[in-house]
Amino acid sequence: MKFTTYTTFPEQTSNESLWILVDSEQLQSNLNTYQINNLESILTATQFKANFNETLPLFGQLSTQPHSQLLGLGKAAELQAAKLAKLAQTIIKSAQNKFKHIAIDIAALPVEYHYLFALSLTQAAYGYDEFKSKKNEFVLQQVDLISSQTSLDENQLALVHAVQSGQSYARDLGNRPGNICFPEYLAEQALALAAEFPDLLKVTVLNEQQMADLGMYAFLAVSKGSERPGRIVTLEYQAQLEQAPVVLVGKGVTFDTGGISLKPGLGMDEMKFDMCGAASVLGTIRALCEARLPIHVVGAIAAAENMPSGKATRPGDIVTTMSGQTVEILNTDAEGRLVLCDTLTYIKRFNPAVVIDIATLTGACVVALGKVLSGLFSPDDTLAAELQQAGEQSFDRVWRMPVIDDYQELLDSPFADIANIGGPHGGAITAACFLERFTRDYRWAHLDVAGTAWLSGSAKGATGRPVPLLMQFLANRVSTNG
């Protein structure tokens, strides 16, 4: 979907439908720009008040656009960002299968919401039909956004397009089943990205023998139960090599049975989404390549499959990590931190400015924050504040949680340096504290996206979060650093 901005209705374009957003407190003034036949009698007859998400068809009443509708904002001054998605869904649901080109008058929408509204339209327009014999009949390609004043300059529109591309790509990867999307497949996707953007990307793939040579036995403890070998993949986005890089590390457990600590069968199909952290890293790298932001970024993917077998790790096994620390694996279903800890050690070779890991790490984070906010853990107040700001700007929000020494003793083991679980309480925090032990040589933040990376129920599927947040964070760094 492509966007173009106009200050007035573009009568010479090929748009087939017009939506006009209207403020319930300024209904008449919002419509003064348009010559609408019988407006007063229509409003009286329909009792249209422009309440939130209330629609009013005006078919044949505008000479400039026969197919037009009003869409209420309620009181625009009281509109909240959380409601933008609903407005976008209303428009997309109505237009997506009918029109290639539509126009939306957003003059009544507060200017500070223009970027988020455009982004919401792209998110609402996503559909996944890769494995369906009957494909979605989506035809919408172009949206004209009309407002005499807008925050959507050329840079903002470029960011919308880039985020749309990266987020949709991440959603596609997340939605693919485990028999298609396995560790080697993620490595192939990274190589395909590099082939698409050869001037921007350098990809390195580590196989299991190379990991063993580096001493990555925590990672290998996860992948050893599977017939599918694990991979660590790095993608270096080389637009500004003289800078120390931002490193993004994604958990890529392509299917998580729990291993010997087997998960319950109900809902296990959703464990294909346990690689959504890695998908978000790949999506962010794609978005960076589309936007060509002048910044140095490294994406790292820890890709493994966690399966039970005669070769699988047993509860109580002890392994040595790449850092030299030993780990007692009390629960093989706490595997994400094991693939991440070795990857977080490996990426030190890039001399990072900051490191952000993204992982569907704990059910405890879902209990704490639900499906609305991602968990943010960082001992670095400045980095945490930057991520919180980016989350608000992109409406891909986070909530900061503690990662403090008081919790570290819960990870003590009588047999090894550290246990891979910390008991029944504060599971999201102790998981972050585990990772913190491997990140003390650089600035670091951890995003637990177990609650936000996918949805269940009727809207089941990957969300592509936190690609919008990560791209906003990187764009902000470009702006700050000039």
Curated annotation (Swiss-Prot):
Pfam families: Peptidase_M17, Peptidase_M17_N. One of its GO terms (molecular function) is manganese ion binding. This is Probable cytosol aminopeptidase. The gene is pepA. It is an enzyme of class 3 (hydrolase). Its EC number is 3.4.11.1, 3.4.11.10. It catalyses: Release of an N-terminal amino acid, Xaa-|-Yaa-, in which Xaa is preferably Leu, but may be other amino acids including Pro although not Arg or Lys, and Yaa may be Pro. Amino acid amides and methyl esters are also readily hydrolyzed, but rates on arylamides are exceedingly low; Release of an N-terminal amino acid, preferentially leucine, but not glutamic or aspartic acids. It comes from Acinetobacter baumannii (strain ATCC 17978 / DSM 105126 / CIP 53.77 / LMG 1025 / NCDC KC755 / 5377). Its main location: cytoplasm.
